[in-house]
Each structure stands twice: as structure tokens, then as C-alpha cells.
């Protein structure tokens, strides 16, 4: 359920200008992507995602609010954030850079799902490795499809942090100390043709 009320002093942002309304999503309900969020995702995924199909849920994906704190779940093409982590617009000027990167990580799972990748199933088999599942190492012989679903999410998030936000402090993979050109190399196949299913994890 969306409540839309007129308010004064709404901030604009670099992705969406001229907004005069603010949407409020009730816990247990969802909202569509904002225009600013779509612009964020477009910087990487272009038109490979049907953005109208994506919903952002306010509340745990799991029963009894069992979703871990500071954890989002995107198993079915929709994002599920705990109540305290949910934002009405991840592109807003007031949003922390790290949360924008987090949003891009989750959009990677949306992209994977819409291209036919079984995010729910592979999520069970990949995340069982714990933090190691998310950490990546860039090597000359590896390209985007050589990384698992969570590593891909972090690669996209860090690319966005460095190349779009231009803020190293917003990177998700804290072990990353390489040059921006290394991320360019790894993401090149995805950026060139985000509709190509060959970019999905092997």
C-alpha cells in the first residue's frame, strides 16, 4: 500500500530531479522502483531488466522476521529489506553511498533472475560458504561469468561506487585495492551486452 502526501522541502538528487511528492510504504507491503533507482541500475544493466516488474518489499522475506540484520534477500526478482533497512528511494540525496552500492548488489540478483538464473537455488548453495562467497579476486584470465552470483553482485556494486559515485569508501568488497581499470576489464562483457546470458555465473 502506498500513501502519497504533499510535503514541503523535498530534496532532489543527481538521478531524479523535480520531485514534489514522497511515497511511504507500510511494513509488509512493497513499492515499485523509483525513477532515480532505475537510472542507477541503467548505468550497468541498461534495458536488460524489465524494471516495471521489480518490487521493493518492506519487511523480511522469511516468516517470523527471520531475515538477518543488514541483509537483503532477492530470490525471485524482487528485493526484500528488513523494516529498518528499507528506504523509499535508494537514489535520494540523503542516502548513504554504501546503501546505494548495496542496492546495486541486489539489482544484480534481479538481473540474474530475469535472465533465467535460479537465484533462490544457487543462493542456498553459494551463501553456505559464508563471507568467502562474497569475496572476489581479480585476475587477468577471469571475466564476469567466472564469478559466482554474490561475487557478481559485489563487482557491480564496487564498479558503481568507483565509476558512478566516484567514492572508494562506498565499495562493498573491503579487500579490493586494485585500479578502476581492473573492474572495467572484468565487467566489460556485461557492460557491452547485459542481455547476453553468457554473462551469468558458470
Which residue stretches match the model-derived regions?
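Alpha-helical membrane-targeting segments
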Residues: 1-11, 61-70, 74-76, 116-133
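Metalloprotease/metallohydrolase-associated module, dominated by Zn2+-dependent proteases
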Residues: 21, 33-38, 42, 48-49, ...
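Short, solvent-exposed loop/turn segments at secondary-structure junctions
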Residues: 59-63, 79, 85-87, 108, ...
Amino acid at each position: 500500500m502506498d500513501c502519497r502526501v504533499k510535503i514541503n522541502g523535498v530534496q532532489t538528487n543527481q538521478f531524479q530531479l523535480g520531485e514534489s511528492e514522497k511515497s511511504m510504504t507500510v511494513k509488509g507491503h512493497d513499492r515499485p522502483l523509483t525513477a532515480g533507482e532505475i537510472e542507477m541500475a541503467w548505468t550497468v544493466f541498461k534495458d536488460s531488466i524489465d524494471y516495471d516488474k521489480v518490487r521493493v518489499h518492506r519487511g523480511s522475506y522469511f516468516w517470523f522476521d527471520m531475515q538477518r540484520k543488514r541483509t537483503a534477500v532477492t530470490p525471485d526478482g524482487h528485493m526484500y529489506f528488513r523494516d529498518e533497512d528499507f528506504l523509499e528511494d535508494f537514489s535520494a540525496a540523503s542516502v548513504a553511498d554504501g546503501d546505494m552500492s548495496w542496492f546495486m548488489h541486489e539489482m544484480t540478483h534481479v538481473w540474474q533472475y530475469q535472465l533465467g538464473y535460479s537465484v533462490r537455488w544457487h543462493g542456498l548453495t553459494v551463501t553456505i560458504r559464508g563471507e568467502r562467497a562474497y569475496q572476489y579476486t581479480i585476475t587477468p584470465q577471469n571475466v564476469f561469468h567466472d564469478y559466482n552470483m554474490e561475487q557478481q553482485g559485489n563487482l557491480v556494486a564496487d564498479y558503481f561506487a568507483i565509476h558512478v559515485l566516484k567514492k572508494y569508501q562506498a565499495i562493498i568488497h573491503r579487500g579490493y585495492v586494485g585500479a578502476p581499470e581492473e573492474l572495467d576489464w572484468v565487467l566489460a562483457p556485461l557492460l557491452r551486452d547485459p542481455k547476453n546470458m553468457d554473462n551469468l555465473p558458470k
